[in-house]
Swiss-Prot record:
Protein name, per record: Dauer abnormal formation protein 25
UniProt organism field: Caenorhabditis elegans
Gene transcribed to yield this protein: daf-25
Zinc found in the keyword field: yes
Alphabetical keyword list: ANK repeat, Cell projection, Cilium, Metal-binding, Repeat, Zinc, Zinc-finger
Listed GO MF terms: zinc ion binding
Length: 388
């Protein structure tokens, strides 16, 4: 934002611009101070979000700054500035505090669209897939006249665990299984976990601002949780952690001659096929896209799903872990260059990977822009019409 000599910025805004957190906090102690605007019309919260300063954003929200305030002239909101700064934690905090993702600026762009334009694809995913923990709490412990009257008490950790599933943009089945295995009470509270996820899922297409992308994402998570729970319950001789990790290895198997993990491919295709809202435009176009490749061939079902949910651009610029699908995988097999996000995933996959490493080394990676292999123009054109 530019200013004129006749209208200099206040010391508070000067401190925010310099990212001098200590100085800014000393000048930001009252609601009156938090209500200031700089000469361009930017609020204190917007300026802090633009600088990606989480501490100052927290303080401004504490002092009751409007998280949906629009900067004079440009109509930019704090969430839009956070999206431009690329600060994922600031985006998440603003949305947890009530920032609305559907607001548009002076040129009709949402925060998500601005983040995508400047290449902050993790912020795009966070904004488009946000669910507050309050939503989980309300379903886990519904209150009557402000008081929970349920027969069973649930630990706070359960709400945090369910929120970590619903609020994340990571939908890979193995990632879901890893989370299941690390939460000690996954099986104990299985029914409640599945119930809450199912209720959040159902709300996505039954509200005023229906969200097809969120609906499909939650369905994939719910499907993985159900399948994992079934497997763990059918292997009672093992601990829930052991059984769930065995299931993860089962769906991660890779046979020589296949370009993808066949069992995982089948599972994801079944998940998409079983999506209950068949009238969904997103579901219909994704189903058609999946028919373009055979099971075990590239592009995999996961590649199609990622592009459908998060856009073709994020799939092109992010390297996904070959085990859990985590974006930004930086580790590589020295021989075949298969990507991993961590030593944990690499170690987990080694008994499987060592059998196909030589085969994968001889395979040339299929280009995602190869029209004969993967052309998602149709699905992207349809997704572009969906208001998300």
């Amino acid at each position: 934002m530019t200013t004129t000599e006749e209208a200099p910025k206040s010391p508070l805004f000067e401190a925010i611009d310099k990212n001098d957190t200590e100085a800014a906090l000393a000048l930001l102690k009252t609601k009156e101070q938090a209500a200031q605007r700089d000469p361009s019309g930017m609020s204190v919260l917007a300026a802090a979000a633009y600088r990606g300063n989480l501490t100052l954003v927290e303080k401004a929200i504490e002092l009751k700054c409007d998280v949906n305030d629009k900067t004079d002239g440009t109509l930019y909101t704090p969430l839009m500035f956070a999206a431009l700064s690329g600060k994922q934690d600031v985006c998440r905090l603003l949305m947890d505090s009530g920032a609305r993702m559907y607001l548009v600026n002076g040129i009709g762009k949402t925060a998500s669209e601005l983040a995508a334009f400047v290449g902050h694809h993790e912020c795009v995913a966070i904004i488009n897939n946000h669910i507050t923990i309050d939503v989980i709490e309300d379903l886990l412990r519904p209150k009557v006249n402000g008081k929970y009257e349920g027969a069973e008490e649930y630990p706070d950790e359960l709400a945090v665990f369910i929120h970590s599933l619903c609020g994340s943009h990571e939908i890979h089945p193995v990632k879901i299984i890893f989370r299941f295995s690390k939460y000690p009470d996954s099986l104990k509270y299985k029914k409640k976990i599945l119930y809450v996820i199912d209720r959040v899922f159902e709300k996505q297409l039954r509200c005023k601002e229906s969200n097809e992308i969120m609906s499909l994402k939650l369905w994939l998570i719910l499907f993985s949780m159900r399948e994992t729970s079934k497997f763990v319950e059918s292997n009672k001789e093992k601990s829930p952690e052991e059984a769930s990790l065995q299931y993860a290895k089962l769906i991660s198997t890779w046979q020589e001659g296949d370009e993808t993990r066949r069992a995982l491919d089948v599972m994801l295709r079944n998940a998409v096929a079983s999506f209950p809202y068949k009238h969904s435009l997103l579901h219909d176009t994704l189903q058609k896209a999946l028919q373009k490749s055979q099971i075990g061939e590239r592009p995999s079902a996961y590649e199609y799903i990622v592009q459908a949910l998060f856009g073709q651009r994020i799939a092109a610029v992010c390297q996904f872990c070959s085990v859990c699908g985590h974006p930004g995988a930086k580790k590589r097999c020295t021989q075949c260059k298969l990507a991993y996000c961590s030593q944990e995933c690499q170690k987990f996959d080694w008994p499987i990977h060592k059998k196909v490493c030589s085969f994968l080394k001889t395979r040339q990676e299929v280009s995602p822009t190869d029209e004969t292999a993967m052309s998602l123009d149709d699905i992207q054109a349809q997704i572009a019409k969906i208001d998300v």
